[in-house]
Amino acid sequence: MSLKVLLKSEVYIMECLLDWCSLTIKKIYGKPATWEKIVSEVLEMDFAQFTELKGNYGYKLQKYSEGIRIYYDGNEDMGIHLQISGDGMRRLENRKNFSWDSFLRNAFFFDAKITRLDVAIDDKKGYLNMDVLNDKINKGECVSRFKTCNTIHKQLIVNGDTAGKTINFGSNTSIVKFRIYDKLLEQGIQRDLVKMKENNIDILNPHWIRFEMQLRDDRAEIFALYYANPDNKLELGEMAKRVINNYLKFVDANEFDTNRSRWNTSQFWTRFIDTLEKLKLTKQKPKK
């Protein structure tokens, strides 16, 4: 089952998907984990689909198969490290009866340690505008747990055309990082009608802003535990937005109130988040 979820019934609204998953498993059925067991028990794939490559992260070797990397042959206490990129995740989703909540429950059954989990929300309707977000930040109309952010404006040297717009909250090593960027510019498909149609972009009003939430270590594991819990009734997008709501909001200035946290939330942000609830990442164990 695809995790690409339409958050509203209309076309060109918002889509939410898991876009990265990294985890480490040390034992399977009481014995040291092996790459073969990761393939058969966790991924449920065939050995023949993988080729051997040089390792990384302290592992001597890795097995690779189109967006899926299994790092092995490290120190005895390192276990096996599984890394699934966005392309690999789309591959797994295309399998019959596949779901990420079941995948994660199975991984937790083998005492997996989730080390990174990325969630992407694609706004193809026009709720988020990169120039508006930058203007809000410049005017101090952003309330956040993050102390700083950095903005990147990428241009083509040949003619000065804008080639990319990005805002980062947090660093690459932060346990929580947000990245908002113009996916249409990043993909370079703003004038390619065929590719826009393939990516479900409104040709008459092309818009594609991606909001990426990158979680690491405890935050990644806690989010995965929530999502894998059979008692959880929230869709992926609802969960992600509640986490975002706990870290970030854009507001409208009020000259009569110096407390920025009391300023009214900007309408565009209210429409994008679509919830007043917040999700604080505290642990709860899922049921098998």
Each predicted region: which residue ranges?
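Structured, helix-rich domain cores that form ligand/interaction pockets
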Residues: 1-286
